[in-house]
A protein has these predicted regions:
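Aromatic/hydrophobic beta-strand junction motif of beta-rich domains
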Residues: 86-92, 203-211, 252
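Extracellular/luminal regions of secreted and cell-surface proteins that mediate adhesion/ECM remodeling
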Residues: 1-186
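Short, conserved beta-strand segments of beta-strand-rich sandwich/propeller modules, principally
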Residues: 21-25, 85, 157-161, 204, ...
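Glycine-centered coil/turn sites that cap beta-strands in beta-rich domains
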Residues: 180-195, 199-226, 232-236, 248
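Generic short beta-strand
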Residues: 108-110, 162, 219-221, 252, ...
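Short, surface-exposed loop/turn motifs with a glycine/proline- and acidic-biased composition
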Residues: 153-159, 235-270
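C-terminal tail/sorting-segment detector
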Residues: 177-185, 192, 260-270
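Short, acidic/polar linear motifs in exposed loop/turn regions
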Residues: 17, 92-94, 168, 199, ...
Length: 270
């Protein structure tokens, strides 16, 4: 470097695991540790050394955990499919420490308590068999996912517990995610009602389905007290249905099959 010259350089280094105040020491024309000679002779060397203090912010934010059954958030005690699709999402605000490695499965623990009250951990693999599928974060967001597709052959009440943390070991919350649910393998439709009842403008239908999958055929008939069918509502009108509790997207407005307003009074449905 000639007298009065300037040299610009860029140094990249990993700051993982060193949160807090750090010091970067930079030395120009350092001594050769083998020959104990400088590359260039200088009258003074003390001004060739710089100490730069810098702060690395510690990651203390908790990641957000989200669990859905067949695309929906369930409540304690809900009925679910005997073959549900359980999706676990872990969303971390830190986009520099991505959960982007297959080895990041160590940041998840999933437990299942069966109707016999036996709790066991669910691992990602059982020998050569994949039990849960892990999708790493791929940026720019830091969202990793677990897909779990169990088969619940035994009827009864289950409890799912999920623990998760980010790269910095921040837990997803003070408490584990825990939800209890019921499985009934036999296909049934129960707890059918309409709400509100009575109604003035429209009413929706509420019902609970059990089994492994939603029915392929379903119809609601509305009749007079004498048994005459005045309105039929098929699945295309009802909207999406699933195993578990349902409330129809369709709202009946008190009209017959031709759109004519029915007389006030009591009607039956099945």
């Amino acid at each position: 470097l000639p007298a009065g010259g300037v040299l610009f350089d860029t140094l990249n280094f990993n700051t993982d695991g060193i949160p807090g105040v750090n010091t970067l020491i930079i030395e120009a024309n350092p001594i050769d540790t083998i020959t104990f000679q400088y590359d260039q002779a200088e009258q003074y060397h003390f001004n060739n050394i710089a100490h730069l203090r810098f702060l690395i912010q510690d990651d203390r934010e908790n990641p957000m955990l989200d669990v859905t059954f067949d695309g929906l958030h369930i409540l304690d005690g809900d009925v679910v499919s005997a073959r549900p699709e359980i999706l676990v999402n872990l969303d971390d605000e830190n986009t520099t420490l991505l959960l982007d490695s297959p080895g990041d499965t160590i940041h998840f623990k999933v437990f299942l308590t069966d109707p016999s009250n036996v709790t066991r951990r669910i691992y990602f693999r059982d020998g050569a068999l994949d039990i849960m599928q892990f999708t790493p974060a791929n940026g720019p967001s830091n969202i990793s996912k677990i897909m779990y597709r169990p088969v619940f052959a035994q009827d009864g009440n289950y409890t799912l517990t999920v623990q998760a943390s980010d790269i910095s070991r921040n837990q997803s919350g003070d408490n584990d995610y825990k939800v209890s649910f019921e499985v009934i393998n036999k296909p049934t439709i129960t707890e059918v009602l309409n709400y509100p009842n009575p109604f003035t403008t429209s009413t929706r239908f509420v019902f609970t389905l059990t089994g492994q999958q939603p029915p392929t055929y379903m119809k609601i008939q509305i009749m007079t007290v004498s048994g005459r069918v005045v309105r039929e509502i098929d699945m295309s009108e009802l909207g999406p249905v699933r195993v578990g509790r349902n409330i129809s997207e369709f709202a009946w407005d008190g009209t017959d099959q031709f759109g004519d307003k029915l007389a006030r009074g009591v009607y039956l449905y099945h």
